[in-house]
Amino acid sequence: MILDVHVSSKLVAKLYRERDEYVLKYLPGTAPEDFVSLTMPVREEAWRWPRDLFPFFRQNLPEGYLLGVIREEFGPLLDGTDLSLLAVVGATGIGRVSVTPEGIQPGVEMAPLEISHLLKAENTTDQFAALVRQYARVAVSGVVPKFIATDAAEPLQPLGKPTLRTGLHIIKGSDDTTPFLGFNEFYTMRVLERLNVVPVAACRMSEDGKILVVDRFDVDEHGLPRCGVED
């Protein structure tokens, strides 16, 4: 399996497995500023990593409950390797780097979500689980279920050319196994905002305390990536 690696919609490298190594090979002519990771600047020689997927790409892989959902929904597309998992979830994510099966353009078209309804509704565990399954391909890595979505009340205007753009919000859920998790993050963000020492992403808490909506800082108002993110 060979994957295409894109930076801000531009194809810059190939990612594949060779024997017991993972390999990232930049395409000829790739500009220095189109690096995939701070740890892997553009160069002619391929980057290699033994046994496991490069750490930069592992940061984007789902885990826990979300990983189980991905396996259930996309099992036939998975071969047991992180490379196949990245092929399913890598097309849209946080930051400017996206990963797709070879020859496929980045981005995933998902139906907009009525966020105002989520903020006022009584959100059950089953209802949020259904949303996680629906938006599994635009899920965000981490143990807590969360995904990227566009608000139906904020239609994106056409840009005039095919360009990767993504949802403006991250939707996070809490259930009986993680009570008050959203509250904890929401009020932590509020405290940081009041301290005024660092920029803080805008966020909203649902009336029932089960849904947290965080506005993304890594995209502009059009949903276009404006910065890279590296954990």
Where are these regions (language model features)?
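Phosphate/dinucleotide-binding and metal-coordinating scaffold of catalytic cores
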Residues: 1-231
